[in-house]
């Protein structure tokens, strides 16, 4: 924020006669820094995703393809979502009913599943810390 105001003050200085170049340079520099940080964050999350995706077949009950796919989705929810994936989104993803999703979720050990409730809606994600512990033994 200070850089923003400094650049703005520089542009408003009488000797600069309203030249907006310093402001534009500062703004482009902020965009550049933000893009690099975003790239690094996405690359880091993608590396983690690939790591956990390769563990999917080794997770409990993953011998059933639907449960392995559920793990796959719950890993994405853990890495790329604040709240997780909603019950409705899971129903849509699997093209099944509420009770079918509940059945699939019950196949995942409770200690591996994080359930968040927001405005009376359930959101799910995989507890990646617990997965790490499971495979570190």
Where are these regions (language model features)?
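Basic, amphipathic alpha-helical hairpins
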Residues: 11, 77-80
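Short amphipathic alpha-helical interaction segments
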Residues: 95-109
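Short acidic, hydrophobic short linear motifs in intrinsically disordered regions
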Residues: 71, 80-93
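Generic recognition of stable, solvent-exposed alpha-helical segments in well-folded globular domains
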Residues: 3, 18-22, 26, 65, ...
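Short alpha-helical segments that sit at the start of domains
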Residues: 42-73
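Glycine-centered, phosphate/nucleic-acid-interacting loop/turn motifs that mediate DNA/RNA or nucleotide
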Residues: 111-113
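Short, cationic-aromatic polyanion-contact patches
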Residues: 115-137
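Phosphate/pyrophosphate-binding active-site loops
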Residues: 1-41
């Amino acid at each position: 924020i200070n850089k923003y105001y400094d650049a703005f003050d520089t542009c408003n200085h009488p000797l600069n006669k309203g030249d907006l170049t310093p402001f534009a340079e500062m703004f482009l520099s902020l965009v550049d820094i933000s893009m690099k940080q975003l790239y690094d964050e996405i690359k880091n999350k993608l590396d983690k995703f690939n790591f956990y995706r390769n563990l999917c077949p080794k997770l409990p009950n993953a011998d059933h393809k639907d449960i392995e796919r559920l793990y796959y989705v719950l890993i994405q929810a853990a890495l790329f979502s604040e709240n997780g994936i909603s019950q409705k989104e899971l129903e849509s993803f699997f093209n099944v009913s509420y009770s079918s999703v509940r059945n699939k979720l019950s196949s995942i050990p409770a200690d591996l599943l994080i359930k968040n409730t927001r405005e009376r809606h359930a959101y799910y994600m995989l507890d990646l810390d617990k997965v790490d512990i499971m495979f570190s033994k």
